[in-house]
Regions:
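General helical secondary-structure elements
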Residues: 1, 15-19, 50, 79
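Eukaryotic N-terminal intrinsically disordered, low-complexity segments enriched in Ser/Pro
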Residues: 1-6, 44, 66
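Short acidic DE-rich linear segments
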Residues: 3-9, 85-87
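N-terminal acidic leader/helix
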Residues: 6-43
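Helix-centric, low-specificity signal for extended rod-like, repetitive segments
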Residues: 13-16, 47, 68, 76
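Short linear, low-complexity motifs centered on an aromatic residue
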Residues: 42-56
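Helix-rich interaction surfaces within compact, conserved domain-sized segments
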Residues: 52, 56-87
Length: 87
């Protein structure tokens, strides 16, 4: 009985993590879409959006700063370099 309850708790944890992962993916997709498509967006606004997205991601996954820096930071940097012709 105790093992069954622990298994249910593990399933619940996995479901919650899956929801947070999906929320992060949707949020980052939206941020990257706005940065790439909004013609009125300034480089400062884009940088602020990227910083806010990082803070939000780390609030969802506090212990995953390295993962964020490896996965999303290069994508955002590349996007901003292409969009604003930064070097």
């Amino acid at each position: 009985m105790e093992l069954h309850r622990a298994d249910q708790d593990g399933d619940q944890d996995q479901m919650e993590e899956g929801k947070r992962i999906r929320r992060l993916q949707v949020m980052m997709s939206m941020v990257m879409s706005v940065i790439s498509q909004d013609p009125n967006l300034t480089v400062e606004e884009a940088a602020e959006m990227a910083a806010n997205a990082r803070r939000a991601a780390l609030s969802l996954f506090p212990d995953k700063e390295l993962a964020y820096d490896l996965i999303y930071r290069p994508r955002l940097q590349r996007l901003m370099n292409e969009r604003f012709r930064l070097q």
